[in-house]
Amino acid sequence: MKISRLPDRLDRMPMLKILVFFAAGIALADRYELPLWFLAGAFVVTGVLALSLRSSAATAAMILTAGFAAAQFRAPRATVPRGVHTVYEVTVEGFPADRGRYAVADASVAAWRDPADGRWHASDARIRLYADSLAGLHAGERIRCRGAVRPFRGGAESYRRLMARRGYAGTLWIAERTLLERLPGRHAGLHRRAVERLSRLPMSAGAAAVVEAMAAGERRGVTPELRTAYSRSGLSHLLAVSGLHTGIVFALVNLALWWLPLFRRGHLLKNLLAAVAVWLFVAAAGFPPSAVRAAAMCTVLQAALASASEYVGLNALAAAGFGMLVWNPSWLGDISFQLSFVAVAAILAWGVPLCRRCRTRWKGVNVVVDAYLIGFVATVATAPLVSHTFGVVPLAGLAVNPLAIALAGVVVFGGALWMLAPVG
């Protein structure tokens, strides 16, 4: 693309410009703090200037102020005391991972008791729950225990900031003697039922860990050795449900429903069923942020296909990203959000045009070339982020990504069919 055509292309992608200034406001709020009354006044003043003077600079300032205010207003706040030994009511989320002498699971704190006056206080904080082998943890159960929520220790400072952005207040260790009561558990959600269905398949422990991680986003069986092996080969992105997995389901569902447009209004039914299938897959995976972003973009694309309107991929991606940042501004600092967004943007901006330029007369060759080019572009685009965050650039992924994506398509789509099938 020529530089001279960049302003014209940006004019056709208004959501991309909005996203840039909104994200800049969120980034500034991470470093500075301003009174909300000041931000409200600045938003009104810049909005009036933008309307009266039709000033693009005032519009940009208004959007930046909105991002700053949203980040400051929606900043994660701990609703549990840290370092205070008291009683907590905790719900275990997902499936606990067995680490030998202890088990670990994500959990949410429903309430905690004030040790000073004995009063209970509601909470919505998330914690990383550790329990020794005698206590035992079960997916979805509610427990009442005694302990203290403590800040994350060890690891890099970036990891602690990441957990804070994701709403984690800290860690809580429990033992058999500090486990006071097991309460009636909540009903199994779609994610738990999906993982339970996958666990019925006759597979080895290693294969089950990979299938559960790729199809349902459940990483309980992923051992440190398996994670390291995938990371060194440049395939660690396959072990967490992300935009790649959602895109595989989107593409294969549309391919499987190719025959519906042969009937009257069949194209509308096809688009509706494809969108529903994508969101069901994301729900079965537990709504990971990168998959939600991809599902939102796929829905925009599906709606564009249904209405036969012009689809601009980057604009749709920007709209999905803007909506997610409005919902949760802290996702801007989430490395999984950053990687998936950069990868998809690079594929749309460079990968798709590159695939068109390398088109041949042989369809089989085109499929292989397209898979390699898409993997190459995504790997190169995300290499700076990966290098900065993890200190390694997995160049091996450039060679093995095409085959890995093809195999991932079989695992993800087959797993999705098994999880969501109404029988079995």
Where would I find each of the regions flagged by the language model?
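Hydrophobic alpha-helical transmembrane segments in multi-pass membrane proteins
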Residues: 17, 25, 29, 37, ...
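Membrane-interface amphipathic/re-entrant loop segments adjacent to transmembrane helices
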Residues: 172, 181-188, 192, 232, ...
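Alpha-helical transmembrane segments of polytopic membrane proteins
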Residues: 37-44, 339-340, 401-406
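Membrane-interfacial loop-to-helix junctions in multi-pass transporters
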Residues: 203-207, 265-273, 407
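Juxtamembrane/interfacial segments around transmembrane helices
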Residues: 51, 62-68, 82-88, 103-112, ...
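Membrane-interface helix/helix-cap signal primarily in integral membrane proteins
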Residues: 2-9, 60-237
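N-terminal leader/targeting segments
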Residues: 1-82, 157, 293
